[in-house]
């Protein structure tokens, strides 16, 4: 805790450091008065105050009554006593690093806390989120330098003897924020009982999300509704995506899913006593998307007028839908004196194609992409190949010289795919 005084037109900046980390900063004229500040820190060797002078003498910075005390700043901690809620944590002038929000259990036996980290944005690497169980063990951490930052992280945490779970957040400026949902239930989601006759239906879908609607069961449960949890479990892996929703809705969108993936979807209702009831399982598949990888490409035959291009079939996990075929792109290299516009051909049911009627001794760029009904995936890296020169035998193909009447020619295709077209 400390007081500071920053008065004058040419005031610059006051900084406070915990070790090498900035924990407080104030810039410019603050009025002819003493201001109070408190910051929660885990002390790293030294606390340093730095006053940076302005460009003139008409500005003074002073500090007074500095104290260091154990504990969390009173204005930087909050107790959450409801069994369901949402937090939208933003930076403000009163925000101090390492602020805490403690979820406390009131009357639910064998309580388990659900924490849904919905969205996080850190302006600096030193921002973070930490979650601790009732014994003080750190269950989860995310720091500002992690790949940002829409999260969909879903935690189930046992309360332990202290009957609380703590969220600790450090934000550094007003571009930083964090959004959470939380709820308390008895036991865990795996203990939910099937509620006969309760169904969910698929309303819409994208390549990464499913939109669901379910029957209103508010009158079915004697102890009322507190919140819903929607789970989408992949049919091909142990990955489960979960979302937390309020009791006044019968619609939800689950995002962060994989394209063209089958999921077992169910809705869990939690009543006022923390008991859970689940709907029948709905099987749903996300929409297709473009392939996420490019095939690896190589050339198997080169003559003076043709190139045979071959590629390894794209592995199934990168299809993101029904793979319709491959697209082969060819063009003269950028340093060609007579550049030719890029041409491409779609190839079906095969992994090779021969490109004919090329110019002898000409360098070409070739690459390949796979495609679904949603479009082309990424292209392979450029494969540079030069056709043979008449009178010289290529190292890995037979010589095939032809007379060319024009520099610009139409490319022809020969492959075992009869429906391919330029």
UniProtKB/Swiss-Prot annotation:
Domain MAM stretches: 1-75
Entry's localization field: Secreted
Gene3D superfamilies: 2.60.120.200, Immunoglobulins
One CC-aspect GO term: membrane
Any matching Pfam family: MAM
CDD domains cross-referenced by the UniProt entry: FN3 (cd00063), MAM (cd06263)
Fibronectin type-III domain mapped to chain residues: 2-74, 196-286, 291-386
PANTHER family assigned to the protein according to its UniProt record, in alphabetical order: APICAL ENDOSOMAL GLYCOPROTEIN PRECURSOR, RT07201P-RELATED
Protein's name in the database: MAM and fibronectin type III domain-containing protein 1
Species: Acropora millepora
């Amino acid at each position: 805790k400390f007081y500071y005084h920053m008065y004058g037109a040419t005031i610059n900046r006051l900084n406070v450091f915990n070790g090498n980390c900035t924990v407080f900063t104030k810039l410019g004229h603050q009025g002819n008065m003493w201001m109070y500040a408190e910051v929660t820190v885990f002390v790293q060797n030294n606390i340093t105050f730095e006053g940076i002078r302005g460009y003139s003498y008409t500005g003074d910075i002073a500090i007074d009554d500095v104290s260091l005390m154990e504990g969390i700043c009173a204005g930087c901690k909050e107790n959450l006593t409801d069994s369901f809620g949402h937090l939208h944590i933003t930076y403000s002038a009163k925000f101090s690093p390492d602020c805490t929000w403690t979820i406390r259990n009131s009357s639910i036996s064998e309580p388990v806390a659900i924490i849904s980290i919905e969205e996080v944005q850190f302006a600096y690497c030193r921002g973070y989120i930490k979650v601790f169980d009732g014994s003080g063990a750190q269950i989860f951490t995310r720091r500002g330098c992690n790949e940002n930052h829409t999260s969909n992280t879903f935690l189930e945490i046992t309360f332990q003897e202290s009957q609380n779970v703590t969220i600790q957040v450090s934000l550094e400026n007003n571009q930083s924020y964090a959004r959470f949902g939380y709820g308390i239930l008895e036991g865990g989601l795996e203990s939910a009982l099937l509620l006969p006759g309760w169904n969910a239906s698929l309303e819409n879908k994208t390549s990464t999300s499913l939109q669901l609607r379910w029957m209103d069961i508010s009158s079915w449960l004697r102890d009322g509704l507190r919140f819903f949890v929607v789970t989408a479990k992949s049919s091909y892996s142990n990955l489960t995506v979960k979302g937390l929703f309020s009791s006044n809705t019968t619609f939800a969108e689950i995002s962060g899913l994989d394209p063209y993936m089958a999921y077992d979807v169910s809705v869990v209702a939690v009543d006022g006593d923390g008991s859970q009831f689940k709907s029948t399982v709905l099987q749903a598949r996300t929409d297709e998307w473009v392939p996420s990888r490019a095939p690896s490409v190589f050339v198997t035959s080169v003559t003076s007028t043709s190139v045979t291009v071959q590629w390894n079939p794209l592995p199934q996990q990168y299809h993101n839908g029904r793979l319709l075929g491959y697209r082969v792109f060819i063009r003269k290299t950028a340093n060609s004196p007579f550049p030719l516009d890029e041409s491409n051909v779609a190839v079906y049911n095969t992994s090779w194609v021969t490109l004919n009627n090329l110019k002898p001794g000409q360098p070409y760029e070739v690459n390949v992409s796979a495609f679904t009904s949603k479009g082309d995936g990424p292209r392979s890296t450029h494969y540079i190949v030069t056709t043979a020169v008449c009178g010289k035998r290529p190292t890995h193909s037979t010589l095939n010289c032809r007379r060319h009447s024009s520099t610009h020619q139409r490319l022809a295709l020969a492959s075992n795919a009869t429906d391919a077209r330029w």
